[in-house]
Amino acid sequence: AELSDRVEYRSIGQTEFGREQPLLVITAPKNFPELARYQEISRKLGRAEITEAEAKALSSQGKPIVWIDGGLHANEVVGAQQLIETLYELASKNDAETLRILDEVIILLVHVNPDGMEIMSDWYMRPEDKTKRNKNIPVLYQKYVGHDNNRDFFMNNMKESTNISMQQYVEWMPQIIYNHHQSGPAGTVVAGPPYRDPFNHVFDPLIITGLDAVGAAMINRLHQEDKPGFARLDGSVFSTWWNGGLRTTPYYHNMIGILTEIVGDPSPYAIPLVPDRLIPNNGNPFPVTPGPWPFRRSIEYSVSMNYAILNHAVRHGDELLYNFYLMGKKSIDRGNTDTWTRYPKYAQDIQKVYDATTKKKAADDEEEAYFGNRSGIPLAFYDSVYADPEKRDPRGYILSADQADFPTAVKFLNALLKSGILVHRATSDFTVGGKNYPKGSYIVKTAQAFRPHVIDMFEPQDHPNDFQYPGGPPVRPYDAAGWTLAFQMGIEADRIMEGFDGPFEAVVYGQLLAPEGSSLPASGAGYFLDPRVNDSFTAVNDLLKGKVKVYRTQSASGSIPAGAFYVPAAGKKILEQAARAYGLAPSAAKGMPAGAKEIKPARIGLYDYYGGSMPSGWTRWIMEQFHFDFAQVFPMEIDGGNLAEKYDVLLFIGPGMPGAGGGYGAGAQPKKEDIPAKYHHMLGRLTVDKSIPQLKKFLEGGGQILTAGAATALASHLGLPVSNALVEIVNGKERSLTGDKYYIPGSVLEMQVDTAASINYGMGPKADIMFSNSPVFRLSPEAGNLGIKPLAWFGTTAPLRSGWAWGQNYLKQGVTAFEAQVGKGKLYAFGPEITFRGQAHGTFKMLFNGLYK
């Protein structure tokens, strides 16, 4: 940046490792004095709080802003390297095309994971022998979550995600966001836009046609330059359904998000021969010839695609800017009127009503059988659904300040604020729809430009039934099918169906909320902390570290629930600080409750392995946020035994445990002599022969193990009378249900909870969980007599809350969590990951309750 008057360096914040995260602004020198004005024009158009005449004027005065990034996944090395080449060309070339781009476009060039690049490059260059260089790093390439850093862009847990979202949705509001990735589908060079169905039903159709336009510019340029191998549409697995990725969350903000996945590596690479990819089709119009593929060629493709997008922005700048406004304006209009989103379930409702009231006519010729009923269904059936007021979208949501876990609701609101959502706060008590709300409640109206994101965070996703052919296997979503954040976090939000107003003040865009704690009430005996509030555990951990004794009630008494924390008056100072910091409202106690038991911090071991586990990393981050002390435990330490000397509780979250059928747990295994000594303790895998006996011994001696997801296979290795509930009998033999009968990709389901169990203190009788073909258990008839009891289960044939659940009727009475007495110790097994991606705040307590002794 110091060497070019076309480039300005900015830091957008610190990473999780404390590095500055860089953003380069690239444009013509003459544009820099007006940069703040162009930025403000983009923000005004994006928020759409101006008239159409103003929008047209600003669209002609402004300059389109294009975001180009790379390096998010550090092992995908093309992404970071193309940034360097693109920077060089834009900063140094003087051809007519480059100069025109610089004159007409504001380019934001961003490295989105500098920590990861440092980790990966240092590791790759470490061996002097070039033939031994590799990318098999011993740790995750983002401090906590590795590859899942591209699953964090509506929650914004990680610092890098927050930095990026604040730039995209609060500061700059680019019209196009281009996110470089690897690797392309086998037999191709690169996958890009447009993408396959389904696309999400809540965003504006101009997003889809905008993707078509940008995609056409990209593929046309590659073809003009004789660069084959661009896969699109159903030529790749990528869709526009899911929210949460760096290039998908922009769709919900009226921005055109571009993903490409390209091949290439510094090590020798070749395009493989895939016969089906040799045939030109709409998904791959210009097939590439298989054979050796130099890394430099991938960089050239990437720069060409960058230039294609920038040229598109030059030629269609005013259109991009005006459409940005138009999508926002239409969102505001939809939020101010009765609006029905066209979900698949509503189309199915129309068909069901029609079929139930109309005598079907058999197709009387081949044409009608093929094309269907050309005359359609009478319009009255449309009105039966799309004039039904119960099926309207809400006009807004109210998060009452008197809900049990309001601090978690504030965290939810901060996730929205980081994404540029407009939030209001009530300055006094008010009434809406006959219900009274206290001062300090928060309001999120849908009459705002980023309405699609608001709807997506509060309302269920309705993924279509998507199969390869009728009766065939499912087409797997690229990531989740449903994710409604309000459900995952367990917040209480009232859906308001009519227009409303009140004593509301707007929160400044992007300004995060601080929890509002209360002063401690007068009490000479002590205080209670509510176990329903997640941050009560944070306060308890602060108290325990301050050497203050803490107790838990064992039964409910009046307004004090079972599992409440009792803090003696000696802890007043620390508790007062915690209440202010975390937004807590401790209540006064008259004295120590009868039967209350003292709790102490457990010595916690969190399992991980060489290369890093993302679910373990998320759990590591969560426990740090809530102030739990812990140590990481690796396979060799487990195999070495004597676990009880160091740990009271062991956590196994997600992969790593050998499967129920035996074998080895997850984890890549380099040769010991090929890695530095400081990583040797991380080597090894859990095995049935060595690891399971040590875990069993730990349990039998009084230890506690908590497992979630795939790690629940431990129950099988221990010989517990627990089996897979999702099976059928075929020819007298038990087998797992096939995908045409049962398939539930990442979706939110509702389970019943045993609130009397101590591991469930603070939970309600129902809880929403993130479920992704997760383990579901069946307890044998003798299980109860052996000290095994269910903690949570599916109570209905239709537990789906958000997403896609084909064959969900099979889930009824399936157990989602259980506890088992093993000798003097206890095993907890949770089929769903109760810590999922740091989003599932509604089930964090199921982990936290097990972390004391």
What residue spans do the PLM features occupy?
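Feature marks short, surface-exposed loop/turn motifs that line or immediately flank catalytic pockets
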Residues: 115-116, 184-186, 266, 658
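Structured alpha-helical segments in the cores of large, soluble enzyme domains
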Residues: 54-56, 128-139, 164, 176-184, ...
